[in-house]
């Protein structure tokens, strides 16, 4: 995994120092960059569909992918999925998402236990009453046996009710009781920390434990992760559960995680979006990357800056060109990462009129200022801050696309290395 450090602007808060955890060779926490991960929504027993979706998520940039392991058929499929992915060249860590019977599935399917890179345990449903600690311990012991890390993932929708009830009763006995919301937040944090302490007592190292505490409200998420960060040095997995569809899910997740990341809290993130019918699952990976890149913490793809448009830009040419360039970059990035090291740092500007167009284009590595309404039908192009040509005629878009491709080849390609 890349260990780049990016600083578009100074970070007002130091990064929280957590214990690094290796997940199939991808380091989460410590001094490693914040990791992007995602989860499939296929039936894991359907090997073909799951392999296809994991491969798509990995190509999109997901550095870790979680899959559901909910029954014998799913567990039996995991080694086949792992083998098929490796044959296709996708060496991506797979995380097994276990609920209720994870201890049994891992025991009954040792090949599954070996093929997974991490186990996810939910303290709220790993077992109930007198079976809870035993079944939790069984999974932890499996992790120790197979040298795998675990994520202890608390979720407010399946919170340990015994713990919550005990805290509620204790709170009522206080002279100045806390609100029910505050007690719930405390229960979530305690569930994670108590489970982590138990895992360590069983023998799992702190460098094998990642914590998460997922809720569906932005302020709750900020509160519980701030508490976790203050009370432990475990690596933290950020995620807003049930964030929702479309812009609502994107805004809610970005608002919550952006605040935490800005405070130095968070070692890996997943943007949980409810896909629209027929929607692309890789969208959540793209949003996670854009969040980290926009905040200046990582670089994944070249930035395409474009003006929002106004009454001076009634033509849609600049919008269409910006979209085409962005889609072309996304489509080619898997190849470009290998062929053009450092291409992630490229910036492209596609502007729509003379007001800010030339200035913005000069600030990009390569930029074009297209004519606005009533302006001369010509488009100056700037490379590394200098005007190099003016494009005219109906082929402006195609000509600029070729210039972008040539710039990438000349700056990041093999020819540059030979010349240097």
From Swiss-Prot:
GO terms for biological process: isopentenyl diphosphate biosynthetic process, methylerythritol 4-phosphate pathway; terpenoid biosynthetic process. Its cofactor is [4Fe-4S] cluster. [4Fe-4S] cluster binds at residues 307, 310, 353, 360. Keywords: 4Fe-4S, Iron, Iron-sulfur, Isoprene biosynthesis, Metal-binding, Oxidoreductase. Binds 1 [4Fe-4S] cluster. Gene3D superfamilies: Dihydropteroate synthase-like (3.20.20.20), Sulfite Reductase Hemoprotein, domain 1 (3.30.413.10). Its EC number is 1.17.7.3. Pathway: Isoprenoid biosynthesis; isopentenyl diphosphate biosynthesis via DXP pathway; isopentenyl diphosphate from 1-deoxy-D-xylulose 5-phosphate: step 5/6. Pfam families: GcpE. One of its GO terms (molecular function) is 4 iron, 4 sulfur cluster binding. InterPro entries: Dihydropteroate_synth-like_sf, IspG_bac, IspG_bac-typ, NO2/SO3_Rdtase_4Fe4S_sf. It comes from the Bacteria. It catalyses: (2E)-4-hydroxy-3-methylbut-2-enyl diphosphate + oxidized [flavodoxin] + H2O + 2 H(+) = 2-C-methyl-D-erythritol 2,4-cyclic diphosphate + reduced [flavodoxin]. Belongs to the IspG family. NCBIfam families: ispG_gcpE, PRK00366.1. Converts 2C-methyl-D-erythritol 2,4-cyclodiphosphate (ME-2,4cPP) into 1-hydroxy-2-methyl-2-(E)-butenyl 4-diphosphate. This is 4-hydroxy-3-methylbut-2-en-1-yl diphosphate synthase (flavodoxin). It comes from Brucella abortus (strain 2308). The lineage of its organism: Bacteria, Pseudomonadati, Pseudomonadota, Alphaproteobacteria, Hyphomicrobiales. The gene is ispG.
